[in-house]
Amino acid sequence: MAAHLKKRVYEEFTKVVQPQEEIATKKLRLTKPSKSAALHIDLCKATSPADALQYLLQFARKPVEAESVEGVVRILLEHYYKENDPSVRLKIASLLGLLSKTAGFSPDCIMDDAINILQNEKSHQVLAQLLDTLLAIGTKLPENQAIQMRLVDVACKHLTDTSHGVRNKCLQLLGNLGSLEKSVTKDAEGLAARDVQKIIGDYFSDQDPRVRTAAIKAMLQLHERGLKLHQTIYNQACKLLSDDYEQVRSAAVQLIWVVSQLYPESIVPIPSSNEEIRLVDDAFGKICHMVSDGSWVVRVQAAKLLGSMEQVSSHFLEQTLDKKLMSDLRRKRTAHERAKELYSSGEFSSGRKWGDDAPKEEVDTGAVNLIESGACGAFVHGLEDEMYEVRIAAVEALCMLAQSSPSFAEKCLDFLVDMFNDEIEEVRLQSIHTMRKISNNITLREDQLDTVLAVLEDSSRDIREALHELLCCTNVSTKEGIHLALVELLKNLTKYPTDRDSIWKCLKFLGSRHPTLVLPLVPELLSTHPFFDTAEPDMDDPAYIAVLVLIFNAAKTCPTMPALFSDHTFRHYAYLRDSLSHLVPALRLPGRKLVSSAVSPSIIPQEDPSQQFLQQSLERVYSLQHLDPQGAQELLEFTIRDLQRLGELQSELAGVADFSATYLRCQLLLIKALQEKLWNVAAPLYLKQSDLASAAAKQIMEETYKMEFMYSGVENKQVVIIHHMRLQAKALQLIVTARTTRGLDPLFGMCEKFLQEVDFFQRYFIADLPHLQDSFVDKLLDLMPRLMTSKPAEVVKILQTMLRQSAFLHLPLPEQIHKASATIIEPAGESDNPLRFTSGLVVALDVDATLEHVQDPQNTVKVQVLYPDGQAQMIHPKPADFRNPGPGRHRLITQVYLSHTAWTEACQVEVRLLLAYNSSARIPKCPWMEGGEMSPQVETSIEGTIPFSKPVKVYIMPKPARR
């Protein structure tokens, strides 16, 4: 046996390997079916015009690629020449216009054919559609002046067509393609330059009103394109103001306004007199006259345009508020003026009354000075119009003119105050907002203030709060006015307790604006007596707090006022200064230290040192890779603490400081999770450390979502860094999961998903990759081919090494960044009385919250209700529930419906506001994604929510239903 084995060992084995010829793989070329061929087949199958029209309608619903457009156009033109039915030719002409707008297709190749078929066409409808197609071609080729002039020539030839539709399209083409310059390029030397304005102006007197309207709109289109219109157009436009059709009058009003802005100082003669006037004043009078037009559409447009005519003379401006009666378009003269004219004339009469039957010249109403007739009482008519749209437009115009003229603001005050009693809520609200905008130029009299304060009884919360805002910036003339305002506001507080915060804020500004008027009222308001001690008021009374807010804010600039305070007033001041610091200012009281605010006034102007400190702190942190892990952690912790404190001290730097601190916190969590002592020992022996790393990865993910969606002003540079940090957190999560998961099947799927995330990052942020040198993603993309073919264990090992070796990316700070915040005003969460309702039914809970620096609150802000049993309910407020009182500020006033089964005792539910986000909607779209590759469902879905308000606890008690 041994000999046999020995023999086998020494034997030589030979093996012949014959290379087999590889079978050549068959290459398949996938081609898309030709759109032009399919259309040709369909049109050939059509047995009637109705069938052909149906095929064309089906084709119009399908998208066409740029490379297929020319072939499709040729097929359509071929069938156009063969087709006898005008409806089919009309549809083909429409399709030619749509196809010429296709991105990536140059329509100059079909222009000659379009012009040829235009010259032979007899149908007016098809002619109009072909002109529309030529307009689309010319709009697509704005740089080719030869084509533009050729199309203008075609339009001019067809302007004599009998159809109004054809003339309309020709004028539209002239307005959009007419040459703005007199210089002609070499390509267009053969074509004579035309005076487009004169051609269009000739059609101002066309017999068809639709053509007249199209001519005016074409002239306005020339103005929008940058061509300066001739002043001669002004007289033509003025004649159109008396046109029988409202569309013509509406367009003419707009054209007159445009010319008045181009030539405001030009002098124009007044008809039937030797006087002259500025063009802007004349135009103002004519537009004022249109405020009394028979059509409410024209009246609205005229009223809106009046507000933008700020160059008009003050004399004509003040005439708009003149209530003098008009007779035959002339001012009614006084009896003295009439008698004087009568006796000075020396005219004959019957003898019973001097000048009784003297012949008088008949008044020519058309020759009367239009300035006198138009501007006189224009706003009076507008504010008393039967249509509320006209009244709103007149109020807005008054606001714009009053802001530029303080004298006009004083004169229009009575009219605005009268509008507070309008029957339409929208008009009342607009009047209040208008008056608030001009409040710096006016001082209210007592009778006006009385009318204004009467609106506090309005049932609309929006009206009342708008009036509170108005009173914040209103000047009152007397102490009786201040007392009247306080009394009415306290009545409002009694009738509508939910207005408490708005009324307190109103009294804060009312007191700070009128310290000298509040001073003589202090003894009466505080019920103090020179000889007797009075009872101490209840500090829980909102009305008493309102009075104190008024007095304390007035005392800030009135040093003699604290001497009138009693002892309990000083105690109440200390209490309110702590509890309502945003309403009660710091006062220098006798015998007491100044209660200073968090930021003293001497520090406020010095913003540069704070900004410098912020920059130095961040630059110091960016040298982390040169430190040992322990030193890096300590440096990050100290810097985060400094940035948080800086945000508390400097409110204007709070957003930047919090944003930077959050980013550094993510880096700190990553460094702690990657400590070597956690990874040198087998994972089963360090389950606690694995949980720590997993929690760190989860927290980093949450912090990155906060950075991306809770801050306004974040630019694309910051979004890239945030997504990079999130990718590192996902890599850490994969590493931890790989160490604690048994089996390879789950890891294959997780690795594949992570590599898809990397590919996703590369595709969407490809333009920013050069700025990510030596970063985690940069190294990851270099090793991407190797990672695609590696086993999960090797992928995890590579990721762990790269996470430790990757550089700390520099976070560029945006210029202006603010953190989103929300404060729930109602419910206050102070009541111990439960809200009782029958189980199974619903109860409405009023929610009132202020939102700061929230982007798109209508789609992102949600209300969450958390029940004691762990159930959570998310409510989507209606868009109408959001108000926008100022830039960066929103107000949410809504109702939340609660329901639950019966409870044995009252418990608390938590109400908070959430910020919903979807990261895919924030990422910039790439060119190849514009074709609708992403479904709309993905973009509108909610990926997660971030709490951004403190929770408020509300007692509720669902009672069992009675049987």
UniProtKB/Swiss-Prot annotation:
Report the record's Gene Ontology biological process terms.
regulation of transcription elongation by RNA polymerase II; RNA polymerase II transcription initiation surveillance; snRNA processing
Q: Which organism is it from?
A: Homo sapiens
Cross-referenced SUPFAM superfamilies: ARM repeat
**UniProt keywords, alphabetically:** Acetylation, Cytoplasm, Isopeptide bond, Nucleus, Repeat, Ubl conjugation
Q: Where is this cross-link: Glycyl lysine isopeptide (Lys-Gly) (interchain with G-Cter in SUMO1)?
A: K791
Sites of N6-acetyllysine modification: K26
Q: What does this protein do?
A: Component of the integrator complex, a multiprotein complex that terminates RNA polymerase II (Pol II) transcription in the promoter-proximal region of genes.
Q: How does it assemble?
A: Component of the Integrator complex, composed of core subunits INTS1, INTS2, INTS3, INTS4, INTS5, INTS6, INTS7, INTS8, INTS9/RC74, INTS10, INTS11/CPSF3L, INTS12, INTS13, INTS14 and INTS15. The core complex associates with protein phosphatase 2A subunits PPP2CA and PPP2R1A, to form the Integrator-PP2A (INTAC) complex. INTS4 is part of the RNA endonuclease subcomplex, composed of INTS4, INTS9, INTS11 and inositol hexakisphosphate (InsP6). Interacts with BRAT1; interaction is required for the assembly of the RNA endonuclease subcomplex.
Q: Where in the cell is it found?
A: Nucleus; Cytoplasm
Q: So which domain of life are we looking at?
A: Eukaryota
* This protein's record includes keyword Repeat: yes
The residue intervals holding the HEAT repeats read 66-105, 145-183, 190-228, 229-263, 277-313, 369-405, 406-444, 446-484
Q: Which PANTHER family match?
A: INTEGRATOR COMPLEX SUBUNIT 4
- List the GO molecular function terms: protein-macromolecule adaptor activity
- Phenotype for R210A: Decreased processing activity of the Integrator complex
What InterPro entries does UniProt report for this protein, alphabetically? ARM-like, ARM-type_fold, INTS4_8HBD
Return the protein name. Integrator complex subunit 4
Write out the similarity annotation: Belongs to the Integrator subunit 4 family.
Residues in cross-link Glycyl lysine isopeptide (Lys-Gly) (interchain with G-Cter in SUMO2): K791
The UniProt entry's GO CC annotations, sorted and at most eight, read:
cytoplasm; INTAC complex; integrator complex; nucleolus; nucleoplasm; nucleus
